[in-house]
Amino acid sequence: MQEFYARVWNTKEMNLLKSLAAVSSMTMFSRVLGFARDAIVARIFGAGMATDAFFVAFKLPNLLRRIFAEGAFSQAFVPILAEYKSKQGEEATRIFVAYVSGLLTLALAVVTVAGMLAAPWVIMVTAPGFADTADKFALTTQLLRITFPYILLISLASLVGAILNTWNRFSIPAFAPTFLNISMIGFALFAAPYFNPPVLALAWAVTVGGVLQLVYQLPYLKKIGMLVLPRINFRDTGAMRVVKQMGPAILGVSVSQISLIINTIFASFLASGSVSWMYYADRLMEFPSGVLGVALGTILLPSLSKSFASGNHDEYCRLMDWGLRLCFLLALPSAVALGILAKPLTVSLFQYGKFTAFDAAMTQRALIAYSVGLIGLIVVKVLAPGFYSRQDIKTPVKIAIVTLIMTQLMNLAFIGPLKHAGLSLSIGLAACLNASLLYWQLRKQNIFTPQPGWMWFLMRLIISVLVMAAVLFGVLHIMPEWSQGSMLWRLLRLMAVVIAGIAAYFAALAVLGFKVKEFVRRTA
């Protein structure tokens, strides 16, 4: 085992674990700040016509951001950028970046202007019920026109971030999303009284947040010599390759968003509160899946792309294997702990005021169901870049479509007996299916060969997770009822339980001969 990891780190690659820690910590900070933002917005604006209008107005730019900026573009752009960096030289890479940024700016400027002009019709499609209330409809239209430029700004910020990631500057793009939260918190606390109606402050905060995310990264882009003026050339082969890859990439990312929308439609037919219970459970799920899964995918895509571009298949396999082992090392205990601690988590974080014990219990059910698929959600973030880095987007797209169909079949099977928890379970099981099919294709196409030692590695993990689970159940047994005490007291108790579980897990690993330094070996 030690020889294997020595080979991994005796390369010219940077210490990926250090990069993972940096990206994960930045993502964690952004998620925590996001929770604070939600709490502040809820406290200042409450829940009513104005906030309904804002969330609808923000939903479309946010959806397009998820589809375009954070998923499809990176999948299409990063592997080709890595190829240019590896084979074409700095000047050719600068020209390539200029042409891609020019086409991106042109396309998104058209989309932004069209969206602002067509705002009333967009609202008619996305929130037809608002048309019955003239004031609400007018406010939503106004808010949408203010927030729509965010699509252009965040997409350009994502372009800059993708370039920085390819140059191994991972922490800078990872920190950028915090500026949106900071902007919204600042505008909500200090600027809202100066707007009429006050909710307009939130819309402007979104656009300002987009500007900050872009501007923050530009000095770092200049440092690596890639700050260029956008240029338009419809005949450049490199830029056109990115455009051609964008089609299937957008389809692939859209499939997951479509699945979430369909699940919301299913939930809307269930008891009142079902959508909210799933939302809060999903927010808890996003911590491990976002912090670990997104961070791993972020650092692996450019690293794998470089290995593929240089023709180093052995290094490519070692990187994939390293990512998968780290995935299982952290995701397996996270999934088990999330299921065991579902009640303490939901009660400690949410059961206050109008959020009743019944609401917490229903959220708990959804969270347990989600936890079944946590490892699948995270493993997909490691396996999918294995295809994207080879400029093969079609295979993951085909698998995503199969997964979407299976998700809906499972929804129909589970929604009757399990209600909203059945919908959560469908998402979790579908993620595991997605991961399994991706792995099968990687092996079938002889893209990835696992390194030796997996059986003993998994045995140690399973034994350690069982020890952790026993400790968690033991500590929970002696804890008083979680609904007792203030929020601070509940969170302190929850923290103590989590620390006990973490200590038990890594202590068991140490007894079984596992050494964390196997993952952190560096070049000299």
Swiss-Prot record:
Q: Which GO terms describe its molecular function?
A: lipid-linked peptidoglycan transporter activity
Subcellular localization(s) per the UniProt record: Cell inner membrane
Q: State whether keyword Phosphoprotein applies.
A: no
What organism is recorded for this protein?
A: Salmonella typhimurium (strain LT2 / SGSC1412 / ATCC 700720)
The record describes its membrane topology as: Multi-pass membrane protein
Homology family: Belongs to the MurJ/MviN family.
Mainly localized where?
Answer: membrane
GO biological process terms, semicolon-separated: cell wall organization; lipid translocation; lipid-linked peptidoglycan transport; peptidoglycan biosynthetic process; regulation of cell shape
Tell me what gene encodes this.
Answer: murJ
Described by its record, this protein's role is as follows: Involved in peptidoglycan biosynthesis. Transports lipid-linked peptidoglycan precursors from the inner to the outer leaflet of the cytoplasmic membrane.
UniProt protein name: Probable lipid II flippase MurJ
- Which keywords does this chain's UniProt record carry? Cell inner membrane, Cell membrane, Cell shape, Cell wall biogenesis/degradation, Membrane, Peptidoglycan synthesis, Transmembrane, Transmembrane helix, Transport
Its UniProt pathway annotation is: Cell wall biogenesis; peptidoglycan biosynthesis
Any one annotated GO CC term: plasma membrane
InterPro entries membership:
Lipid_II_flippase_MurJ/MviN, MurJ
Q: Which residues cross the membrane?
A: 44-64, 103-123, 146-166, 172-192, 195-215, 250-270, 284-304, 322-342, 367-387, 396-416, 420-440, 456-476, 494-514
